[in-house]
Amino acid sequence: MEKEVTAIKAQKRNPNRVNIYLDGEFAFGLSRITAAWLQPGRKLTQVEIDKLVNADDHEVAFQQALHFLSYRARSEREIRKNLAAKGFSEAIIDETIEKCKAGNYVNDLEFAGQWIDNRNTFRPRSPKLLKMELRQKGLPDATIDQALEKVTVPEEELAYKAAQSKAERYQLLDWQSFRTKLGNFLLRRGFSYQVAMQAVKQVWQELADHPTSPKTHLNGEIND
């Protein structure tokens, strides 16, 4: 049994979607892309109606994925979780992911590289901690290891950079307190004790050698 398209009206809250009326009654909403070929007077079979609704579900899922990606890069698993939370079926999610991959909107290796570069630039941490973070994002070890292989900055340099970002806050402390606080900070960033202590000593000495260093900062010697 066929139904006739009697009206196509733009939605007030979303100009990119339209409401479809069949036989004079509201039937369902569609994206403008999905409804582009429809016009009043067109008659639809139930099979065609089902295809339209299914196609719209796929389009809505894809647009949701793009919206989710608009804030920052995402891993494949992050997108899957977001779409599942929005109520999309596993089949639609799978197809949406493939569509995103085809458009290079989703690439876990590129995501890992961007994540690592961002961390190393603004909040340095050890490769060990980076790997843990990327695992939490759902990336496989092979992809993470491939991304980490491209990192050319030595771990000691990353620890030193991280130490520098906090050193000024502790510059009035004596050596023991300085070492404890800054050392613990670096350990939380995933650096080994040896690497952390090397960075702490280097930063302490630089602060002590600075001509404007507070005299209170120089009280105390470096004793392991």
Tell where the protein language model's regions lie, with residue ranges.
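An alpha-helical, amphipathic repeat domain used for nucleic-acid recognition
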Residues: M1-D224
